Regions:
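N-terminal small/polar loop signature for handling phosphorylated ligands or for N-terminal nucleophile
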Residues: 38, 50-114, 202-261
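Conserved beta-strand elements of the Class I
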Residues: 52, 101, 187-188, 291
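Short, surface-exposed alpha-helical segments at coil->helix boundaries
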Residues: 61-66, 132, 197-201, 301
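Gly/Ser/Thr-enriched, mixed-charge loops and adjacent short helices
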Residues: 15, 115-244
Length: 310
């Protein structure tokens, strides 16, 4: 089998298995995590010695996590293990814990044989290009040193962050739970057999949605279809929308940092307009600037500009 290991400024990703330089396996993981820990120790701006680790529901997740936990504690860091969690939840946990960094174990929308390590700073944000390059340099040079027996870290399991994240959403001024309850929405969801299945239903119930039609919510990591949320992979939920007479459908990728919205007629609401629609709502209540990524459409700019006269 052809194995792949891709090293980039945003982390490492690869197919599980292979020789140390050819796949994502324990030796590759140890080297890279030790380099990240060395980088954090030299550069962190916070006093704590904690790093948060969360993962999606990939089959390889438990193995990768054990190697990551062992390496971080071997480098002298205490690890807050939040286990199965969405990428945004792990990012939130870093700041809530006052941690000096975080590692997310997910290959996002890649197929099940892939996994990856995504690296966060103390703000719960991804490392920038220069920081990522420095981690790669440390890894290549093996310029790291493990802790002695009196300075090993410990693992701190913490299963509270799913609920903390849901509560932080409910506490947002712009989230009108009463309006959602009153609408009596019928909602279909497809969570592609990963961590969306353990958080999206609970979030919807907390928002007052009573009728949820679930597809692939068991988080076993054997993805029921190609996990990238694009139209050709979403035929099943489109069919369900009609049978269930659902008002809206939501599809997430394995680590829940991508969202596809399905309209009541079963067609996909164009992904690049999701941000535009949300921005329109936010700006109508709190006018101001928006920040976009390179894949955002011009429509976001147009919506933002339309509110500048208010």
């Amino acid at each position: 089998k052809l194995m792949t290991l891709i090293k980039s400024i945003s982390g490492i990703r690869g197919t599980i298995g292979g020789s140390p330089e050819d796949g994502l396996n324990p030796l590759a993981i140890v080297k890279f995590v030790a380099a990240y820990a060395t980088f954090i120790r030299k550069n962190t701006k916070v006093e704590t010695n904690k790093i948060v680790v969360g993962r999606d529901a990939r089959i390889s997740g438990p193995m990768v996590k054990q190697v990551v936990l062992g390496t971080l504690t071997g480098m002298g860091f205490d690890v807050v293990d939040i286990d199965l969690a969405t990428t945004p939840t792990t990012e939130l946990a870093v700041t809530m814990e006052g941690a000096c960094g975080g590692i997310i174990l997910t290959a996002s929308h890649n197929p099940k044989q892939w996994n990856a390590l995504k690296l966060l700073n103390e703000k719960g944000e991804f490392l920038n290009a220069a920081e990522g390059a420095e981690v790669l340099r440390i890894a290549a040079a093996e310029d790291f040193e493990f802790a002695d027996v009196d300075h090993l870290g410990k693992v701190i399991p913490n299963a509270t962050y799913k609920q903390k994240h849901i509560e932080s959403v409910l506490n947002l001024d712009l989230v009108d739970v009463e309006a959602i309850k009153a609408a009596n929405f019928r909602v279909a969801i497809d969570c592609v057999n990963s961590v969306g299945g353990i958080v999206i239903p609970d979030l919807l119930y907390a928002l007052g949605v009573k009728e949820i039609f679930k597809l692939h919510c068991a988080p076993h990591g054997n993805f029921s279809h190609n996990p990238e949320p694009i139209p050709e992979n979403l035929t099943e939920i489109s069919d369900l929308m009609g049978h269930a007479k659902a008002d809206v459908g939501f599809v997430v990728d394995p680590d829940v940092d991508r969202l596809a919205i399905i309209c009541e007629n079963g067609e996909m609401f164009n992904e690049e307009y999701t941000l535009v629609a949300v921005s329109d709502y936010v700006l109508s209540h709190t006018p101001g600037n928006t920040v976009s990524n390179l894949s955002s459409s011009r429509a976001l700019r147009d919506v933002t500009v339309s509110y500048t006269h208010l």
